Amino acid sequence: MKLIKQSLALAVALALTGCGGSESSIQSADGNDSKAGPEREDVAGQGVIRVLSNRPDLINGGDALIEVSVPDAKNARVQLNGKDIGDTLTTMEDGRLRGLITGLALGRNEVAVFAGNGSVVRKTIINHPKGGPVFSGPQVQPWNCTNTNAVDDKCNQPAEFELKYVPKSKFDLFAESFDPASPGLPGAFLPYDPENPPPSEDIAQVTTDEGVTVPYIVRVETGVINRDRYQIMSLFQPQQEWTPLSPQEQWNGKVLIHHGGNVGVSYSMGQPPNGDIAGTAPEGAEILLGDSISVALARGFVTLSTAQANLGHNVNLVTAAESLVMSKEHVIEQYGPVRYTIGTGCSGGAIAQQHIANAYPGIYQGLIVQCSYPDVWTTATQFADYNLLNEYLGNQISEDPADLLTFVESLLASPVLAVQWPALYGHLPLNPIVSDMAFFPSAEPDQENCPGLADQAEVYDPQSRPDGLRCGLVDYMASQFGERLPEVWSPNEQLLSRGFTGIPLDNTGVQYGLKALQDGVITGEQFLAVNRDIGGLDIDINFQPQRTIADPEALKNSYRTGAINTAENLANVPIIDLRGPDPGIAHDAFHSWQVRARLEETQGHAHNHVIWYGAFPLAGDTIFTTEALLVMDQWLAGIESDQDETPVPHKVIAHKPVTARDRCLSLSAPFSEEGPKAPYTGNLFYPEPQVAGLTPEQIPTLPAELGQILDVATGQVCGLDLGELGLPDIIADPLQPIADEVVEAKKLVVQTRFGTPRTVAGEAITTLNNKCQLKPVDPADYPVNILNGVYTSEGFAQKVSEIFPDGVCDYTQPPVGEVPTLTWLQYGDEQTVKTGGEPLPTSTDKVAGWASPAFGVDLNPRGDL
């Protein structure tokens, strides 16, 4: 056992003994007396039983990794539900007992440790089905099991294992096997047959970050948890055993969770995503587009992905979090306790991380987000606005080429000239088109091809099947948002005598194009016309002449549950955001700064947030994910080493490495302590050169300090900061107004930090107003401009008041329905839903197996509300 693992074990032991005593030993995870059954006359013993693999009340699958710390532990008698299980526990070097206990019954179980003096220590464990739910409440139905080995309707099956390896030269192998008739990029791994293994000289050798050198052979475990697939990969030595008490030496105790992109729903099983930008870029492109997953494996990480945490397969953040909780428990029970966990993912993979980290803190210790958004439901407001403006302007491209003439005619007939459209959208017109084609259809409850349904139910049709299954994004959030109230029921809801899932979107009072009017880009008549005729969306996500009105309960619950990510619970996690320009592919660059603004609003700072910007579209640079993994690993290792009682948010800032700094360009990549990296080369040269004849020794190592200087210098390209240049005030002060204008121009030209219809309407970059508070129309908002038809502010304001009789958005006020985001909410059991969720009971235990003690992981609801 290497030094770091010994130190971790000692730190855990100290944490456990510090929580000993009769009080903690007789309390269950839910805070109730842990005695199961009639009152006992037992004498409470000294010591503690600790569940390492999860909170004791969240255990699933019938097993749990536990640790017993009592005096004279080797002579104690251990029972599970009255049956001796002492032979399943192993005495560790420090005298503690540790082991994987199995055979837990569904519901409450009791572990009891009897000492020789007749005293007893007890712990209640609440076990949930491996197929779920644990805390998400009633599961989506119907559900289609697509695995042939399923043994029940929860799709459960035994885990399956296969071995793969990385060839010594992937590039040479690719060149030798390239088929012009079927071109493609090589995958990261090749099949490994233990009965007929490849020659050892054909297998790459890797040295982990702890100095262990092994062949680059990977074991891939696949199985089913929570009715859907998971995948675990680990660097593996086929001839050796691996147990949670004795992991193979190449594991460094760290976990990397990777996620998939897009957004959607499904009524059947999916596939765990692979690749940093899975779902956003083609599979197999890792060698060119970057692959931090294979780099992590080579460094000794275990990697995890689940289909349920793939946003393109499952928009519901609660079941996504639940799948990670259950799967991370499985990792600990089969592989061993974890030091810390890093997330990575692009687009929907970034949303999933930031959603989950804010609503269920403790699952991750660090986030690497790429081509990111903050969440689904404020982004949905942007995309809904796009859809309405597209309808109004005629900016809609049919998939049928025959309709091209119709599109051209709509352009010519548009009430606003095409050159004026960006002033309304806040972005190039291509962005709304991509949004409408790629994402908006997922919101429609009557999707023609409802994903995964497989004819198990008929899909909703407002005319012919009002009782059909509604297949939209909102409908997948029923437990979180709740049903609509009877007073707003549509005819179909009245027919069914039940409300559909409420919509947390609203455009009441939104003045579309306000900034465009103020800047003189559109005329007063155009401004009045778009706001008079823009309309809204009904419950079926169809256009209606009236503005969209949010359902109050859904709106409040969207904040409460974390569906709207206010970023108020992210201070415990470092975040590295990787960003490139977006000319109109609906992955707006401004989202990185949107998250930063939310952090600044809730935390008072954004010191735990780093933005790396590069020229590669959306992603910034193809080497960013690998670089970010190395920097995040360094950041978390620093936090892990801090055993002080300092709050974790303070540790996050205190141990921020110098390499965790904002970047405008990726030119500093060659100046790296981990070895030089060439921008835009993916994994061609790092960690091992894949070009024939090139070795690491031939690539010169450059001073890392030069990288810091280069980042400061190139940072001026993106956001001229005179303070960074160290100029005296007498020079800097007169230049500052000019610099401010330059900065604003560079945000647009260099970083494509465009806006949205709501920022054009006056909302701040945080864009947290899914529904705004209203104020009376103010003539001051409409400066006189004879050229665009605003002759008097008062007269124009009167016309605006006729369109907005109840007032217009007041973005100086908090959003309507905004409440604090509660963490670790539960939504009932398989039969009964708790709409909007209720916080889990507070646990008295740290979940010691989830992360090193310095991270203080307890999986508890927020205690400061």
Q: Model features per residue range: what roles?
A:
Residues L16-G18:
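C-terminal motif of bacterial Sec signal peptides marking the signal peptidase cleavage site
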